[in-house]
Design a protein with these regions (language model features):
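NAD(P)H-binding glycine-rich loop region in Rossmannoid oxidoreductase-like domains
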Residues: 1-31
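Conserved Rossmann-fold NAD(P)-dependent oxidoreductase catalytic core, especially the SDR/UDP-sugar
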Residues: 11, 37-78, 96, 102
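Structural signature of the Rossmann-like NAD(P)-dependent dehydrogenase/reductase core
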Residues: 11, 50-53, 102-105, 144, ...
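Short alpha-helix in the Rossmann-fold core of NAD(P)-dependent oxidoreductases
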Residues: 14, 24, 29-36, 52-55, ...
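Short-chain dehydrogenase/reductase
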Residues: 27-29, 76-84, 118-130, 160-161, ...
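Hydrophobic positions on the long internal alpha-helix
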Residues: 35-43, 90, 170, 174
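Active-site Tyr-X1-5-Lys
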Residues: 62-63, 74-112, 130-140
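C-terminal substrate-binding subdomain of Rossmann-fold SDR/epimerase-dehydratase oxidoreductases
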Residues: 131-262
Length: 262
């Protein structure tokens, strides 16, 4: 960092499998928390002035409906805890070293580049739309829904799905805001609308026929529902989404998986 005169950092590195985090806390502590601490230590006595950090809406814990940035953190799972602790490390380091931070609390990131040229290769983190896209290429697709006894309308988890291309744009705008305004911020990154797992699967079933839906027990660490209050987000960054369409998100993910296969 010092050798290359780095002035701004976008910190995305972390493990992100909610279930795995519960089973292997040491792995997640070392990579997510200690990794962040090591990065901050490397920033000491450097030219770094700004850092954008990818956090998670999971730090809010069990909420009902829309959640704003003012809500007190209440992480329920270990993955969420690692994000919360990383946020705290960044805030503390900022006070001690006079640099600005932008904390972006991601809601559920999904989809791929509309062009079909860029997407996610990792298949093991258990994200719903990624799994649906993978299954779309199979002759006999099977979808697992983890939990149908949550306190939601149809019993399945509700999430706010945000297109990855929109999220990438947020990082650029967030970094520009730090440079132009010299003010730190914490913002939700979502569209402000939630879809249940069942709703997403039902949309997918209209795209792919013959889907075998299997209901399983809840996954440890999952919360019932959460979606973003985006008022502060849009006000500060003057941001407007380009891909706020759940069908577009699903189709872009499927398009990417087809490219990987070919």
């Amino acid at each position: 960092i010092r050798d290359n005169n780095i002035t701004s950092i976008i910190h995305l590195a972390a493990y992100l499998n909610v279930s795995e985090a519960e089973k292997n806390k040491k792995k997640y502590f070392k990579n997510n928390i200690i990794g962040t601490k090591n990065l901050l230590e490397a920033c000491k006595n450097s030219k770094v002035e700004n850092i954008i950090f990818s956090s998670s809406c999971s730090i809010y814990g069990n909420v009902k409906g829309s959640v704003s940035e003012n809500r007190k953190a209440n992480p329920q799972g270990y993955y969420a805890y690692t994000k919360y602790k990383s946020e705290e490390l960044i805030k503390k380091f900022s006070k001690q070293n006079k640099f600005k931070y932008g904390i972006l609390r991601y809601f559920n990131v999904a989809g791929a580049s509309p062009s079909g040229k860029i997407g996610e290769i990792e298949k093991s983190h258990g994200h719903l739309i990624k799994n649906l896209a993978i299954e779309s290429l199979k002759k006999n697709p099977k979808i697992k829904i983890f939990g149908n006894d949550y306190s939601t309308k149809d019993g399945t988890c509700i999430r706010d799905y945000v297109h990855v291309s929109d999220l990438a744009d947020v990082h650029i705008k967030g970094l520009k805001y730090l440079k132009d305004n010299q003010k730190s911020f914490v913002l939700n990154c979502g569209y402000g609308k939630g879809y249940s797992v069942k709703q997403i699967v039902d949309i997918f079933k209209k795209i792919k026929k013959g889907v075998d839906v299997q209901y399983q027990k809840r996954r440890p660490g999952d919360i019932a529902q959460v979606y973003a209050n985006t008022k502060k987000f849009k006000k500060i960054l003057k941001w407007r989404p380009k891909y706020n369409n759940i069908k577009l998100i699903i189709h872009s993910a499927i398009k990417w998986e087809k490219k990987l296969k070919n």
